[in-house]
């Protein structure tokens, strides 16, 4: 039996090199953790798409099951889960996030 939420997530991740599942949207994040990841991605200058888990309870639960990761936000780069706010922040500060984007050939302004 197919899971329509998983299919949606797989489709969004496949269609968008940088996909962020978050509370709110890029213009109006609804939690501090989501806002921090948006701030980092914006500072790096990488185009990204978002999905607001607050608009769809099935998506909110489904993304956690899909990734086996208990929290939101969740950042995906080139189809792979990078992590949540703490991991993204650490990778940004160390230069690993820019290096990952370069390795995956994802256009961004800040180099490693």
Q: Which residues fall in each region the model found?
A:
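Local sequence-structure signature of Cys/Sec-based thiol-disulfide redox active-site neighborhoods
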Residues: 10-47
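Thiol/disulfide oxidoreductase modules built on the thioredoxin-like
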Residues: 65-71
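Non-catalytic, surface beta->alpha helical segment in thiol-disulfide oxidoreductase systems
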Residues: 77-109
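Acidic beta-strand-to-loop metal/phosphate-binding motif
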Residues: 21, 74-78
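TIR-domain catalytic/interaction hotspot
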Residues: 7, 60-65
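Flexible, polar/low-complexity N-terminal or interdomain linker segments that lie immediately upstream
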Residues: 1-10
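Thiol-based oxidoreductase modules, predominantly thioredoxin-like and allied folds used
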Residues: 42-60
């Amino acid at each position: 039996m197919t899971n329509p939420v998983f299919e949606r997530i797989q489709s969004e991740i496949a269609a968008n090199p940088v996909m962020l599942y978050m509370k709110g949207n890029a213009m109006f994040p609804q939690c501090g953790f989501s806002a921090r990841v948006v701030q980092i991605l914006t500072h790096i200058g990488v185009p990204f798409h978002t999905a607001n888990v607050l608009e769809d309870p099935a998506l909110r639960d489904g993304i956690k099951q899909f990734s086996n990761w208990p929290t939101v936000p969740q950042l995906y780069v080139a189809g792979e889960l990078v992590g949540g706010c703490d991991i993204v922040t650490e990778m940004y500060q160390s230069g690993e996030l820019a290096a990952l984007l370069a390795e995956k050939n994802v256009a961004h302004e800040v180099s490693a």
